[in-house]
Amino acid sequence: MVKFIALITAAGSGSRMGEDIPKQYRPLAGKPMIYHALRTLCGIARISTVCIVLAPEDTEWIRHNWREFAGKIQIFNCGGATRAESVTNGLKALRAANHVQDQDWILVHDAARPGLSTTLVERLLDQLADDEVGGLLAVPLADTLKRADDAGRVICTEPRERLWQAQTPQMFRMKLLLEALEKAPAGITDDASAVEALGLSPKLVVGNAYNFKVTYPQDLKLAELILRERAIT
């Protein structure tokens, strides 16, 4: 039977946050940031395993209590210098541990997207389980885009029709994803880009604005509000 396996990338340093600890461990709504996505993914019955890819030198993970997820999580200290390297290393570690088959689905998620909801994950699974390629959560672009010159002057306004903002999870079969990442050009920033480079067209599944990536310190307040509101409702 084909399995669904989640893989959370958590090997980054979070340098843009200006913190002494990696961003994924930054306290958020009373828990480390990574906890919120981990809880959502572990709560999905169709997902058999949630793998967390940490940096080899990570010392923060063991400082926290993860017992509630025992039996469903797998830790790999094999993160690389880039997101693509971390995902590639995680997939190879899964294969070496005999936890995955070529046709199993892999859902790659960023630890810094704590606003991921059960509804979004279930929607992704429903819409992609029988897809030939796979796909990703994304939201149609709402903001007006300006292209600038080197002096910070507007060159033109870019049309936003058919433009989407990529989110995670991004879901592809194990064999395809590993092949795509191993052949990917330098500088790719997500898994879908690697698959696109093979000439394939991933499917866009509508996400929502709550599933944004926490990147800068000011993002933390918004993420905190979202998570606390969710806890109340």
From Swiss-Prot:
It comes from the Bacteria. Coiled coil: none annotated. Keywords: Isoprene biosynthesis, Nucleotidyltransferase, Transferase. PROSITE patterns: ISPD. The keyword Cell cycle does not apply. GO terms for biological process: isopentenyl diphosphate biosynthetic process, methylerythritol 4-phosphate pathway. Its EC number is 2.7.7.60. It catalyses: 2-C-methyl-D-erythritol 4-phosphate + CTP + H(+) = 4-CDP-2-C-methyl-D-erythritol + diphosphate. The keyword Transferase applies. The record marks R16, K23 as: Transition state stabilizer. The record marks R160, K213 as: Positions MEP for the nucleophilic attack. Pathway: Isoprenoid biosynthesis; isopentenyl diphosphate biosynthesis via DXP pathway; isopentenyl diphosphate from 1-deoxy-D-xylulose 5-phosphate: step 2/6. SUPFAM superfamilies: Nucleotide-diphospho-sugar transferases. GO terms for molecular function: 2-C-methyl-D-erythritol 4-phosphate cytidylyltransferase activity. Belongs to the IspD/TarI cytidylyltransferase family. IspD subfamily. Catalyzes the formation of 4-diphosphocytidyl-2-C-methyl-D-erythritol from CTP and 2-C-methyl-D-erythritol 4-phosphate (MEP). This is 2-C-methyl-D-erythritol 4-phosphate cytidylyltransferase. It comes from Nitrosomonas eutropha (strain DSM 101675 / C91 / Nm57). The gene is ispD.
